[in-house]
Amino acid sequence: MNKLSEVTGLDKDNRLVAIRYANSVKKEDRTDRMEDYLEVIYELVQEKGYATTVDISSYLNVSSPSVTKMMQKLDETGYLKYEKYRGIKLTNEGTRIARNIRNRHGLLAEFFMIIGVDEETANNDAEGIEHHLHPETMKKLEEFINELKKHN
């Protein structure tokens, strides 16, 4: 048994299976970047009542043409309605996905803060991994946090 196996309790074959699984799972043909766009659009609409390509460009630190290209892709996939110079509106499915991402982010950030991570780092770390956790893992994490809250 090597050191990593001792720490993780996983042998090499199990780690390889996990790597294969992580690289084969598709999130309904969504990329992490698509989810970031949906999340930003949702947050902007919640905050301002609307989202513009300029706002999205600013928040995601990407060019306006990149935003326009992604808006067209998200429109084609049915996550939003986009008409150049007319605005951006999330579809019901786009809203559902954005809320789910927002909830995952909040849950992860809350967990990190419970274990003593400062808020800024907790949010940055949550942003980095919110797209990669299995729904069952998120469910168990939520149950764990709720149990902790009962005892505090």
Feature annotation, model-predicted:
Residues 1-13, 127-152:
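C-terminal regulatory/oligomerization modules of transcriptional regulators
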Residues 1-31:
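N-terminal leader segment of winged-helix/HTH proteins
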Residues 24-62:
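N-terminal helix-turn-helix DNA-binding core of bacterial DNA-binding proteins
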Residues 33-36, 52, 93, 104, ...:
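N-terminal positioning helix adjacent to the helix-turn-helix/winged-helix DNA-binding module
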Residues 53-88:
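Canonical helix-turn-helix DNA-binding module
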Residues 59, 97, 114:
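Residues within the alpha-helical elements of helix-turn-helix
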Residues 86-105:
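Basic, amphipathic "hinge/linker" alpha-helix immediately C-terminal to the N-terminal HTH DNA-binding motif
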Residues 104-135:
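Arg/Lys-rich, alpha-helical DNA-contact motif
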